[in-house]
Regions:
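Mature soluble binding/inhibitory domains
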Residues: 1-3, 67-72, 87-92
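Tryptophan-anchored aromatic micro-motifs
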Residues: 1-37, 73-75
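Residues that flank catalytic or metal-binding motifs in active/ligand-binding sites
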Residues: 4, 60, 83
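Edge beta-strand at a domain terminus
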Residues: 7, 77-92
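Residues in well-ordered beta-strands of folded domains
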Residues: 9-11, 52, 88
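Contiguous, well-ordered beta-strand patches that form the walls/edges
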Residues: 16, 29-70
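Beta-turn initiation residues at beta-strand->coil junctions
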Residues: 55, 75-77
Length: 92
C-alpha cells in the first residue's frame, strides 16, 4: 500500500467536483493541503485514510482507498459522497 506523504496529481472521476486541472495535494505527516491554481492552499488534517479539511471547510472529508500505486478518493460533504477522484504521485 502506498504511503500518503508526498505530492499528488488529481484526476476527477465523477460527481459534482470541479475540473481538477492545475490542482494538486501536498501531504506531510498528519497534515496537508489541496493547492489550487494560483497557489491558494486549502489545509486539511490526515487521520488514517481521511483528509479532514479545516474550517471553514470542515464539512468536507476526502476518504481514500489504496489503488495500484496511488489512491482512489471519495469527496464527501456532511458524510455524503459528492464526487470521486484519483491521486497519482507527481513526477519530481
Amino acid at each position: 500500500m502506498p504511503g500518503l506523504d508526498g505530492d499528488w496529481e488529481l484526476q476527477r472521476l465523477s460527481g459534482v467536483l470541479p475540473p481538477l486541472a492545475g490542482m494538486h495535494k501536498q501531504i506531510r505527516g498528519d497534515r496537508g493541503a489541496t493547492v489550487l491554481p494560483g497557489g491558494l492552499r486549502v489545509p486539511f488534517a490526515v487521520v488514517a485514510h481521511e483528509l479532514r479539511y479545516r474550517p471553514p471547510f470542515s464539512m468536507v472529508v476526502d476518504v481514500l482507498e489504496a489503488e495500484g500505486g496511488g489512491w482512489h478518493g471519495r469527496a464527501t460533504v456532511f458524510g455524503q459522497t459528492v464526487g470521486e477522484f484519483r491521486m497519482s504521485r507527481r513526477a519530481t
